[in-house]
Amino acid sequence: MLEYKKQWRENNPDKIFNYNNKRRQLEEEQGNGITKGQWLEMMNFFDWKCAYSGEYLGGKQNDNIRSIDHIIPLVLKGENEVWNCVPSHVFYNKSKHDKEMLEWYILQPFYSEERLNKIYEWIKYAEKKYKK
């Protein structure tokens, strides 16, 4: 599977370029993004774990699997702000793609009501602290 993905990327540089440009444009349109301090605060809030699965994302060894997921995707007009983001394993972030969090999350085998409540706590906390 990895070889297929690598080959696809090599054969489709134009598609990757267009995707990356569209993504950057959406991020620019949807807000300022997250500061490093906000990112660290978010990671600490979730104990350096994936908000969805609870898998540990801390440490250098996990740099390649750690990502930030937009709860409401940018393509659905979600904001590129800290209150719309959670730490996610890159695999689950890609799996969710452009779906809203709840519709995707409740179908996952690792779904947890406790973690869902933690996500809602984060949204409430971050909105109160950062939303103007």
Predicted regions and their residues:
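Histidine-centered nuclease catalytic patch
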Residues: Y52-V90, K96-E103
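Glycine-rich loops and low-complexity Gly/Arg-rich segments
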Residues: F91-S95, S112-R115
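Contiguous alpha-helical segments
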Residues: M1-I65, L102-K132
